[in-house]
């Protein structure tokens, strides 16, 4: 249960960090435009088919120093894969420790040590066999 929660939190953090990065735009020739999403490609195709000029608004965000996309992408993937490997290895250790505690068996003074419950519970049937009810 907690492993699933950790994975969901990790995915949420990764999604928000990816959405927080500005979209890198490539400077192309004067006649060409950079299309960053498929919806923009469809919009541009529709406007060209109708014969209307497509006007693109520029964002008012300040220009940041842009690293080469390949280096930035490679570094972030390496960091994320390293983080994920550490998280998985730490979770495997705790799962193994917990599973060995259960695989050792029950102590002799445990309440159901004399019964044949091997990983399943049979609620009601054994208690009904032990007691006779008057009809």
Curated annotation (Swiss-Prot):
PTM sites of type Phenylalanine amide: 123
Residues in coiled coil: none
Organism of origin: Paralichthys olivaceus (Bastard halibut)
Localization: Secreted
GO cellular component: axon; extracellular space
Signal sequence annotation: 1-20
Protein name: Cholecystokinin
Role: This peptide hormone induces gall bladder contraction and the release of pancreatic enzymes in the gut. Its function in the brain is not clear.
Family: Belongs to the gastrin/cholecystokinin family.
SMART domains registered for this protein in UniProt: GASTRIN
Chain segments carrying region Disordered: 26-75
Record keywords: Amidation, Cleavage on pair of basic residues, Hormone, Secreted, Signal, Sulfation
MF term (GO), any: neuropeptide hormone activity
Basic and acidic residues compositional bias, start-end: 45-55
Keyword Transport: no
Sulfotyrosine PTM sites in chain numbering: 117, 131, 133
Domain of life where this protein originates: Eukaryota
């Amino acid at each position: 249960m907690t492993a699933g929660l950790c994975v969901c939190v990790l995915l949420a953090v990764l999604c928000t960090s990816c959405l927080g990065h500005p979209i890198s735009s490539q400077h192309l020739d004067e006649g060409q435009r950079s299309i960053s999403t498929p919806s923009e490609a469809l919009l541009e195709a529709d406007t060209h088919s109708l014969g209307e000029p497509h006007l693109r608004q520029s964002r008012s965000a300040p220009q940041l120093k842009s690293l080469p996309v390949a280096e930035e992408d490679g570094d972030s993937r390496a960091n994320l894969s390293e983080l994920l490997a550490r998280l998985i290895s730490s979770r495997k250790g705790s799962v193994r420790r917990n599973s060995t505690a259960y695989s050792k068996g029950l102590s002799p003074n445990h309440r159901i040590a004399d019964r044949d419950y091997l990983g399943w519970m049979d609620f009601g049937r054994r208690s009904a066999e032990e007691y006779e009810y008057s009809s």
